[in-house]
From Swiss-Prot:
Record organism: Picrophilus torridus (strain ATCC 700027 / DSM 9790 / JCM 10055 / NBRC 100828 / KAW 2/3)
An example molecular function term from Gene Ontology annotations: phosphoglycerate mutase activity
Job description of the protein: Catalyzes the interconversion of 2-phosphoglycerate and 3-phosphoglycerate.
Highest taxon, organism lineage: Archaea
Disulfide bonds: none
InterPro entries in UniProt: Alkaline_phosphatase_core_sf, ApgAM_prokaryotes, Metalloenzyme, Pglycerate_mutase_ApgM
Enzyme Commission number: 5.4.2.12
Name the record gives this protein: 2,3-bisphosphoglycerate-independent phosphoglycerate mutase
Family according to the record: Belongs to the BPG-independent phosphoglycerate mutase family. A-PGAM subfamily.
BP GO annotations: glycolytic process
Length: 402
């Protein structure tokens, strides 16, 4: 049996970029190691959730790990909160949130200039309203998670986040009668937090420095903790997660995986790429399954920066050299969780390239790992197929039937 390393480059898929004379960032990147893996791979295209579906990183990671989003997904908030180490109990409602910059009632920047440290702000806006305790914890850059703890709460509420700039933050609405209390308390929380943020020393200092204040919390993705089957019970694989992204850590934590903490694991473009794959090489000796998430490709896509996306891919390509000589003992899977084309600055419904690489498998005659070359491979799959194929190629699957 072989151990499995699943590398997910978040938002990997792209469209042709004029900056690269019609190539995608992946095609334009210098990627000798990824191409070498491709020559020892079964490869093709994957729809993370389904054809044409613009999946989020939450639903796509669930799908790739073999958990149907239709069954297990009820909101992103719980995963974000768990990934930040927050405790959630039955009846709690969790949200993901952005610190944003609002002026004259309009959202001018949903990321408040990609503010790097919001811990003081999160402590300041954690509060109690009526019989509900509201805890805010900062994530990477502008991101945060919010947990509501108290009686009679519901996740059936709308977002305050308009999901685009030059729009007003929205009033939270109950989506059914049982959610009226939750919506009322959330709207009061948003009002009070706005007053606190506008007067907070962190934001006053930022304005004096000519920076955007983080003076609004945009809330979205309400949910309660789903009952996710333990990964080991499901696949009999001892699993570990390497990621600087709270969402991914939260999904993997809920699935019972070990979360690996490392120095300089940022979840940003300035990632510790070399350290990640050194750690993966070390962990592959004692874990059956390792998932690695690289967030920088997605960040660059959202920022419409194909040059940075190419650079992230090249950094990954260089660092992956630490494990590509272990193909006698490893099955290495490389893919994205969705496409984030730089010309769109958002997720698209396009499929992503995927390859399953190891020695002694029926490799396809594909020389390059990119969105178009892998069309000549043998695979056209969905995310829910990945673990089944991985178990088969690693000689871990069980026979179906007599």
């Amino acid at each position: 049996m072989k151990n499995i390393v699943l590398l997910i480059m978040d938002g990997l898929g792209d469209n042709p970029n004029p900056e690269f004379f019609g190539k995608t960032a992946l095609q334009a990147a210098y990627r000798p190691n990824l191409n070498a893996l491709c020559r020892k791979s079964i490869c093709g295209l994957m729809d993370p959730v389904g054809p044409g579906i613009r999946s989020g990183s939450d639903t796509s990671h669930l799908s790739i790990l073999g958990y149907s989003p239709e069954r297990y997904y009820n909101g992103r908030g719980p995963f974000e909160a768990l990934g930040l180490g927050m405790e959630l109990y039955p009846g709690d409602v969790a949200f993901r949130a952005n610190y944003a910059y609002v002026s004259d009632g309009y959202v001018l920047d949903r990321r408040a200039g990609r503010i790097r440290d919001t811990c003081e702000l999160s402590r300041a806006v954690s509060m109690e309203i009526e019989d509900v305790k509201i805890t805010v914890k900062s994530g990477t850059e502008h991101r945060a998670a919010i947990v509501m703890h108290g009686p009679g709460l519901s996740s059936m509420v709308s977002d305050s986040d308009p999901h685009r700039e030059n729009e007003r933050p929205m009033e939270v609405r109950p989506l059914d009668k049982k959610a009226e209390k939750t919506a009322r308390i959330l709207n009061e929380f948003i009002k009070k937090s706005r007053e606190i943020l506008n007067k907070h020393p962190v934001n006053i200092k930022r304005m004096n420095q000519g920076l955007m204040p983080a003076n609004e919390i945009l809330i979205r993705g309400a949910g309660m903790v789903p009952d996710l089957e333990d990964f080991y019970d499901r696949y009999h694989l001892k699993a570990a997660c390497i990621s600087g992204t709270p969402l991914i850590k939260g999904i993997c934590r809920l699935a019972g995986m070990d979360i690996i903490n490392m120095d300089n694991l940022t979840g940003r473009v300035d990632e510790n790429y070399s350290g990640i794959f050194e750690k993966a090489h070390e962990l592959a000796k004692k874990y059956d399954f390792i998932i690695i998430n690289i967030k920088g490709t997605d960040i660059a896509g959202h920022d419409r920066r194909p040059d940075i996306k190419r650079s992230v891919i090249e950094n990954v390509d260089s660092a992956i050299s630490k494990i590509i000589n272990d193909l006698d003992d490893l099955l290495i899977i490389v893919t994205g969780d969705h496409s984030t084309p730089c010309n769109l600055g958002d997720h698209s419904g396009d499929p992503v390239p995927i390859m399953f690489s190891s020695n002694n498998i029926r490799s396809d005659n594909v020389m390059l790992f990119d969105e178009t070359s892998v069309r000549n491979g043998s695979l056209r799959i969905r995310g829910l197929d990945v673990m089944k194929i991985a178990l088969s190629l690693s000689n871990r699957s069980e026979k179906y039937g007599a």
